[in-house]
């Protein structure tokens, strides 16, 4: 028995000893504590096992032979959470790298306890706050990387204490203040990369004390003053990168003494004077960028000494004189850009010696002479742009035979002769632009092999012959411009093969025959102009299939017959010109559906019947409504008074009768209103609009008189000749139209054009009665709470205007006081007659709102579909929308900063719920202040999901609808046409700017056109932050100003031009919460704490 006990004791002792041996050492436990503050969503740190004896084999850990941890490298592991200073318990730690993760929070001050640290890399995370002064106590530090975070404040002036520092990389933050002169103490510093911040002041001359400096990168800041001459002391400097600042003065000749310089990037500043000849002493120069300054004078011939240069860009200056032939000595040159200067003389044939040249752009100058034959032998030339000069003669015949072109643009010159045949020999040509020259002959059939071509622009020449059938094999063509030539023949049915075509211009030629019905295959076409030809026949109804078209011009031909009703399906049309043809019949009533139309030209035809009252629905008409010189009869519809933006109205030379509607006299935008030569009676309405117009606009109506005269007498016509219209009237009215557009329409055209050019095709209508599809009618068809359709009619007084709460793109919202005393909001969606978007909105909104519940989301009580009425029943918000509240005057605005802060946080939480907690994820698509509704306590509720997009909803018909409202639309949508949650975040950032500034999202054109640009411009112009804040707010409270400044930063994060740089909504909620929780005031001004422009990723900072 005793022996057994002894044996058992030995076993237990051995087991205990084994455990002691296998237990994790102190450094391993420190790392596990450090890991506890991180979220390892991808499991990269799964090898960090507490059962190991030491951490030396763990992922990202490096040790000495004595198993002491010296390096923690967690780069790119998708980690989030916060950075714990517990890591400094690793006393042998020399390197800490957590870059390219999602770690947030401030940089811990206690990192200063890492006394042996040599490398600290926190780049590309979500760190915010200031750079802790305590970091300057780590005197062993050699490399400090803090780039691509959200740090603000200034560089600690104690930075000079880091005597061992070799590399300081802090670009892409929101740092401000001056470059501290104490950096002169950093004798071992080799690299400074501090671009894309908000540093101001001058470049300190003391920086010349950094005698080891090789790279000085301060691009994209707000630095001012001249370039310090003391920089010549930096004899080790290879890269001087100062682009996009506010530097001015002349480039000092002393820059030529920095003998090792390889990169000199001074572009996008305000440098004046000439390019110093001493720049030719920089014989090691590789890249020289001086573009977008105000440089004058001639390019020095000494430029030819830069024999190792690969890229030289002097574009967008005011340089004069000849292009130096010495450029031909730089045999390594790959890029030469001299465009947009005032350069004269011929193109030097010596450029033909640059056999490595890839890109040559000499456009927008005053160059003359011929194109040197030598250029056609450059084997690596891919981009040649010579447009907008005074070049003449023939294009070299072998151009393209030896060169692998992708872009070739020689437009806007005086080139003559035939088009050479070898442009696309290597099948890489993407753009060929030879327009606005004097080229003659036929379009070369050799282009039939150019499958790569996307843009072919040969307009405004003297080309003859017919359209080569081979052109229609170029399936990648998106733009075909052959206007204003002498081309003839029929339009081939093969035109329909170009299914990627977006722009087709065939105007001002001699084409005959009919437009082939295959034109309907061009379903991506945006602009189609075939005006001023000899085309006959009917306008093909198949044009109604070109649903993306925005500009259609068929004027000045010989088209006859009725106008196809199908043209009313082109709901994206902005400009429709059918004038000067032989069209008969009535104006299609379906034209009332073209609600985006800005210009409608139907004059000079044989149209008859009445003017459709539906034209009054074209409330976007602005440029012109011209239905003159036809055979129209009946009265002028009173509905034309709805065209509140219209500037030019031509109704003259018809057979119209009755009186002039008083509503037209109230169109304050009207510049021209010609209703002469009709059968109108009565008096001209005595309004300011008509008072400023000449009486000739009303002449030729024998029963019409001017009310301003004491004795009302008929107005005498100036001319009633239809022939006068056909000969010169059309041109005269066009001239008047253009003049008025220039004077009165620049801003509004830009405003509407920017908004509508980014809109996409609406889907075909799908009947709501179809209940076979899930998530559409099954769950929510019957309204909740016992509401009936008749009850809703009674509660809204038959949808009276008196109870209208608001109007939107999808419908009108009414206040409904139900018989039981409950108040709700009823949204009546637009009828099908206004397009399918209403029913798509109905379906998407139900599918979305019916499934979610959140305190900051507007509740959907139910919906009702009755005959053709689609009704949504919402929770009533007594305080209306945020937009309405912000638009009130100073005395009526009920929103102090505390209320605005709570609204910002509540709306952020609602949007965060949609993005992160709904399955599938919901993207709102139309976040704006008018869609953030307020209850009686001013609590925010996100509403109006008429444009909502469920990422995975198979049956949602709103997926290709336009995303957002003008002023709120993310910039990337214009070219990607894709909607992501980042678009919502951009829009929400605009809402935050509205809350802070009190300004609407759309600003005058001279101020940038939208609120984001206005704020960015104010910051760049050093406007004090407090002057950007809403004047109705109390800015005497420091805490309030501090919170507003922080929310302004958040807004600028959200409205970053790069979607990848925008935070998630969870991060936005966290930042807004932290803004109020912050206890200390920032000492720096926000005026320059935010990067406002994204740099090209290929450029160094």
UniProtKB/Swiss-Prot annotation:
UniProt repeat feature LRR, residue ranges: 66-90, 91-115, 117-137, 138-162, 163-186, 188-210, 211-234, 235-258, 260-282, 283-306, 308-329, 330-354, 355-379, 381-402, 403-426, 427-450, 451-474, 476-498, 499-522, 524-546, 548-569, 570-593, 595-618, 619-643, 644-667, 669-692
Glycosylation, residue list: 39, 57, 78, 97, 161, 174, 236, 257, 368, 404, 476, 490, 510, 521, 529, 626, 631, 674, 728
Ranges annotated as biased composition (Low complexity): 1078-1088
Class of the enzyme per the UniProt entry, highest EC level: transferase
Signal sequence bounds: 1-23
Active site: 926 (proton acceptor)
Domain Protein kinase: start-end pairs: 799-1081
Gene Ontology MF, one: protein serine/threonine kinase activity
Segments passing through the bilayer: 735-755
Catalyzed reactions: L-seryl-[protein] + ATP = O-phospho-L-seryl-[protein] + ADP + H(+); L-threonyl-[protein] + ATP = O-phospho-L-threonyl-[protein] + ADP + H(+)
GO cellular component: plasma membrane
Modified residues (Phosphothreonine): 788, 796, 976
Keyword 4Fe-4S among UniProt keywords: no
Listed name of the protein: Leucine-rich repeat receptor-like serine/threonine-protein kinase At1g17230
Originating organism: Arabidopsis thaliana (Mouse-ear cress)
Lineage: Eukaryota, Viridiplantae, Streptophyta, Embryophyta, Tracheophyta
